[in-house]
Amino acid sequence: MTTVEQIIDQLKTLTLIESSELVKQIEETFGVDASAPVGGAIMMAPGQESAGQEVVEEKTTFDVIVKDIASDKRVSVLKVIRKLTSLGLAEAKEFTVSLPKALKEGISKEEAAEAKKDLELAGAVVDIV
């Protein structure tokens, strides 16, 4: 019989009060918390994955796609497009003719959200992908 099996056999003989005292002493001795995680979630150790479960990496770069611009808001959207990019007036106007089109590519989530907010306030329909 291994040491672990012997310990398990001894644990089986403990009363509920003795078990509670054992848990308290283990917590104090090793500086751990034996209480269940909040919400009852089970945490897996880093690197452990369930069989058949795919690892999904969080996306770090985003594209801002202008899908449509209301005709009465075109001028205000042009101003925002010029502010967000280095496009001149003619290039910005040409950009708005053939939509949907990516305005900014490979940018951070925060930058994409800010660009989307500015464009939508100006009157554009925008997606972040």
UniProtKB/Swiss-Prot annotation:
Gene3D superfamilies: 3.30.1390.10, Single helix bin. InterPro entries: Ribosomal_bL12, Ribosomal_bL12_C, Ribosomal_bL12_C/ClpS-like, Ribosomal_bL12_oligo, Ribosomal_bL12_oligo_N_sf. Its main location: plastid. It is found in: Plastid, Chloroplast. Keywords: Chloroplast, Plastid, Ribonucleoprotein, Ribosomal protein. SUPFAM superfamilies: ClpS-like, Ribosomal protein L7/12, oligomerisation (N-terminal) domain. One of its GO terms (molecular function) is mRNA binding. Pfam families: Ribosomal_L12, Ribosomal_L12_N. GO terms for biological process: translation. GO terms for cellular component: chloroplast; ribonucleoprotein complex; ribosome. Belongs to the bacterial ribosomal protein bL12 family. Homodimer. Part of the ribosomal stalk of the 50S ribosomal subunit. Forms a multimeric L10(L12)X complex, where L10 forms an elongated spine to which 2 to 4 L12 dimers bind in a sequential fashion. Binds GTP-bound translation factors. NCBIfam families: L12. Forms part of the ribosomal stalk which helps the ribosome interact with GTP-bound translation factors. Is thus essential for accurate translation. This is Large ribosomal subunit protein bL12c.
